[in-house]
Amino acid sequence: MAMESSIVIKVKYEETLRRFNACVINEKLDLDIGGLRDKIIQLFNFAHDAELTLTYIDEDGDVVTLVDDEDLQDVMRQDLNPLRISARLNAGERSGRASARSSGNSTPLRSPRVQPPFLNLNSRVSDVLKYIPEPLRESVMKVCSDMTASASSSAPILAELVDAMSEMGLSYYQNQASGSQAVKEAGSCSGISKGNTKSADGGMPNVKIGESSPKKNRPLTALHGEPKPNASNEAVDASVKLVCKSETLEGDRTEDLSSSFKGSKAQTSLVNSLEKDKKFDVRSLDGRTIGYAYVRNSPIPPEKTSDEQPSKGHPVAKPVDLGGSASSSKVKQCNWDSPNADSSGSSINMPYDGFTPSGLVHLNTVNVNDSHNAGSSGSSMKMPYDGFRPAVRHLGPLIPVNACPFSGVPTVNNPIPPQNFSFEVPLKRSHNHSDGTGTIFHKGVRCDGCGVHPITGPRFISKVKENYDLCSICFAEMGNDADYIRMDRPLTYPNPWSFKSLHDLHGRLRPRPPTVPQVIRGFGLKAGRPKLDSRFIQDVNVLDGTIMAPLTRFTKIWRMKNNGNLVWPQGTQLVWIGGDKLSDRFSVELEITTAGLAVDQELDVAVDFTAPEHPGRYISYWRLASASGQKFGQRVWVLIQVDALLSVPKKGLVHEAFQGLNLNLPPAGSGVSGPDIINVNSEPQNVLPEPKSSSTMELVDSVAEVNQNKEQEAKFPINDSLLVGFGDKSSSPSASGSPISYPVIDLTEKPSADSSMQPSAAVAMQAPLQDARGNFEVEMSLLQELEEMGFKQVDLNKEILRKNEYDLEQSVDDLCGVAEWDPILEELKEMGFCDKEMNKKLLKKNNGSIKRVVMDLIAGEQ
C-alpha cells in the first residue's frame, strides 16, 4: 500500500515569498524538476520559457542548486519540511516576466531572430477571450478550435488572426467602458472604397483602403516557413467573417448615437475585406491592429502640407513584407490626416480626434517610411500631432530593437534601431540595494582620526574621551566596540536644515563662502548660531606652578577674549566650577560697561585668592557665565605650589636670605653676563667671622660633611622672581643681635692669596640649605608632589630625586621615561598628539590625568 503525505515548499523570488503543498508518495515527490519549474513560473507569473536558477538550503546549511530529478530525490532523503527554495531569473530573462509586458501585445520586448511557431498561443487565446463580447465568444472558440486542428503549419496566419480578434475585442471593450460616442460604419464587408475623398460638409475624412502596388520585398519564409494554401485561405475567411460580424453588432448598437454630431457625420471604416493570400497587417506601433473608432470635439483637423517631411531626428523604418511570396505580397500602410495619398499605392486615413490612440502616447507627426521611398511605394504613415513634443520614453516597451514597428515581428534586414528614443525601464523598489546609510551625514561633527568634516555614515562616539568622534573608516582601524557608541543617524535639532539636496553629495556640493574655520566637536552647535563664547589669551601674573608660602594672599589676572558672535552683557561673571577652593567667593563680576564687551575685544579678569595652609599643589578652575547662569567659553585655572619651607624660621641670618629657593629652575651659573654679586650683608663689617659666634660654628660643623662636592654648591641658584609674600622682609643683622658679618663675593674675579678664607665663608653661607633637616623636608615635599602626579613608587622617586640633586623637572623627565607615564604618552600618540615634550608638560601640569591633558590639547588646537 502506497504511503502518501505532503511537503510544504516555500519559494522566494526577490521580496516575494509563495508556498504550496506537494504530494509525497513512497518518499518520492510527486513533481519532477520540470513540473517544479512550471509551478514556480505559474506562481510568479514568469514567461513560460523563462530560465530559472533554483537553490535551496540543505541539511548542512549549504546552498545547493536544483538541476535535475536526482537533486529532488536527494531533497526527499534529507526530510526537509518545509523545503525553502530561492528562485532567480537568469540575466537574459529578467525582462521576460509576463506581468511586465503591455497587455495585448504578443511580441516579447526582446524579439528573438527565430521564434517558435506556436509561441504563447494559449496565452493569446486567453487574452482574446477576456475581451470578446458575449455574443461572439462561442463563435470565436469554435473558429479557434478549427484553426488549431487544421492549420498546424500556418503559425503566422494564426498569429495575425488572434491579434485581429484581440484588437476587435479591445475596441469594443474600450468604447463600452468609456461611453464614447461611436459612429456608424460606412462601406460593406465586401467592397473597398475608391478615391481619396472627404465628407461633403467638411467634416472628418472618410477612412478608405486602396490598392497597394506590389513590392519586391524579401519574403519571410525563412522565419515562418511556407504556409499551406488551404490553411491560409481558411484563416483569412474566418478573419473576414469575424470582423464583419463585429462591425454589424457595433453599428446596431451605436446607430442611434450618431445624431449627436453637429456639422458633419463622422465616419469610420475598419479593414473589412482581405484578398486571398494577403495578410491582415494594418498595425499600430505596438503590434496591434488599428481598429479604433475615434471621436473628436472639433471637426477641423490640423493643417498639414502635402509635402510634409519626416520629423527631424525621428527614426525611419522601411515597410516589411509579411506575405507568403514576393509576387503577391502587399502591405497596407496607415496615414492619419493625410490630405493626399500617392496614386501608386494605398493609404489608410485615420481621423484626427484631439487625442492619440492607445500605444501612441504623446507623439509628434512622424513619417515611418523613408522619405526617399515614399514616392515610389506610395505608402506612408503619419502619427497624430497633439500640440507638444513627445515624451519619447513612453515608447520604450512599445518599439523593440530590430523589430518592425507595424507588426512587432523581427525583420530580416535589421533596420537601424531608433536613436532618439530613450528606453527607460522604471526601477522596482526591490532593485535598490542601498540601505541609505551612505547619504546620511552628521552635520557639524569632525572625525578626530582623519579630520573629515562632516562625518558621513555611522558615527562612533568615544565613551572614554570627551568630544572624540570617529568615522567608520577610522573606527575600523583604531576603534573597538567597548569604548565607542555607534550612531547611525544624526541628532535632531529644533529647526533642522532642509535635506532636499542631500543626494547631490557625490560631486555636486555647493562651494561654501570663505568663513573663519571653527572646530566643532561632539554634538556641537550650528554654524552661524548666535552664542556667547570666550577664549583664554594669557596669564597676566601668577604663572602656573608659582611657589608660595602658606596663607599668602595674591591676585590672579587672566586675559580673556570675546570670540563669539554676541556681546558680553553687563553682569557677566567668572564662576568657580571645580578644583581647590582658594577663594572665599564663588563668583566675581566682570568690569563691563552697560554697552557690554564687543566681539573680538579682550578683557583682564582678576580674582583674589589665598594660598592654603598646608604645603602641596593646588589648582582651582573657573569659567565665564552670563547673568542668567549659562556657562560659556574656555575654562581657566590658577595653579600654585605651596611650600612650607618658605615660612619656617631658621637659625641665623644667613638662612633668611635664602628663603624662597626655587628648586625647579635650571642652574643659573652658565649664562651670567658680567659679575654676579651676592650681597649677603646689608651692612658688611668684618671679613672673617668672630670665633665667639657659636651659631656660626654650629652651622659650619653640621654642613662640613655634606658639602664635600663643590659642584653641588653651584647648582643652587638664587632667584626670587617667583616668590610671593616676602617682599616686605629685610635681612637686618641687628635682629639676631649677632655682630657677625659676611663679605660681598664677586664670582667673576679670581680669588687672591689674601682672601684665602673666602671659600670657607661661602661654605658657611650655603650651609643652612644643606643640613639634614632641610634635605629631609625638601625631599618629603618633592615626594608628595611626585605622588600627586601619579608616581607611586616612593623608593624610585627618592633615588631619582637624589640622583638629580632634587631638581624636580629633571626628576619628572626621568620618571616619565621609566615609570607609569609611558603608557599614557603612547596612548596620546595614538590619539594623534605626537608632541612628546608638550604631552609631558601637560601631564605634569594635570597630575597625570589623561582626560585633562586631552582637553588642554584640544583647547590649544582651537
Curated annotation (Swiss-Prot):
Transmembrane segments: none annotated. Residues 6-90 form the PB1 domain. The keyword Metal-binding applies. GO terms for biological process: autophagy; defense response to fungus; protein transport. Residues 811-860 form the UBA domain. One of its GO terms (molecular function) is zinc ion binding. Its main location: other. It holds the Pfam family ZZ. A motif (ATG8 interacting motif (AIM)) lies at residues 817-824. Residues 92-106 have a biased composition (Low complexity). SUPFAM superfamilies: CAD & PB1 domains, RING/U-box, UBA-like. It is found in: Vacuole; Cytoplasmic vesicle, Autophagosome. It comes from the Eukaryota. InterPro entries: Ig-like_fold, N_BRCA1_central, PB1-like, PB1_dom, UBA, UBA-like_sf, UBA_NBR1_C, Znf_ZZ. The ATG8 interacting motif (AIM) is required for the interaction with ATG8CL. The AIM motif is required for JOKA2 function as host autophagy cargo receptor. Interacts (via C-terminal AIM motif) with ATG8CL. This is Protein JOKA2. It comes from Solanum tuberosum (Potato). The gene is JOKA2.
